[in-house]
Amino acid sequence: MSKIVIIYYSSTGTVDAMARRASQAAEKLGAEVRLRHVTETAPQEAIEQQDAWVAHRREVEQEPVASLDDLEWADVVLMGSPTRYGSVTSQLQSFIDTTGPLWGAGKLADKVYAGFTASQTKHGGQESTLLSLYTTFHHFGGIVVAPGYTDPVKFADGNPYGVGKVTGETSELDQDDNAALDHLVARVLMVSDKLTS
């Protein structure tokens, strides 16, 4: 079974919940899993303006932080980020910007990649956020495995590019969110296993 790393940024916890669900799905399928958040780079005064952001920072501060070793180790890379004006957060982008040495050595190529995101509003930049991630993955020489509409659950979340969660008033994942994440994980692992067998 493949080795999968789930690398994400979450300010208030929604993308964190998505990452944890993806991690659980991968473990159930027998994959080796690393779950890693990226370093927080926002100024403390910005974080302190939202109680949920402060609380989430406390929840994850002792958990492992993503490293280049995690990327090199993995056969499958899932990345997650909230939308920020139709793109990934600066925190995740800062991590991506450190990958040059691995990229230059060809160590990011030929891995399976996919993404997930969340926004407060419907169509709040989810597709463009995923596509911006995928542009990076193409530069890596990665194999992007989007879910498309390969399972009926994709008609519930409506996002063929990855998994997108609309938070609205709540950041809790619902049955459709969980099913979409489970399907994405099963799909990337299935493709990776075919490529490595």
Question: Where are the predicted features?
Answer:
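Aromatic side chains
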Residues: 8-9, 85, 95, 113-116, ...
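Phosphate-binding/catalytic loops
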Residues: 118-122, 163-172
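N-terminal beta1-alpha1-beta2 submodule of the flavodoxin-like/Rossmannoid cofactor-binding fold
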Residues: 1-105, 166-197
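Short connector loops at secondary-structure junctions
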Residues: 34-45, 148-161
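Short amphipathic alpha-helical patches
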Residues: 49-50, 94, 101, 119-122, ...
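Short, glycine-/small-residue-rich phosphate/pyrophosphate-handling segment
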Residues: 109-156
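A charged, well-structured terminal subsegment
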Residues: 138-159, 167-180, 188
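Short clusters of hydrophobic/aromatic residues that line enzyme substrate/ligand-binding pockets
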Residues: 108, 161-164
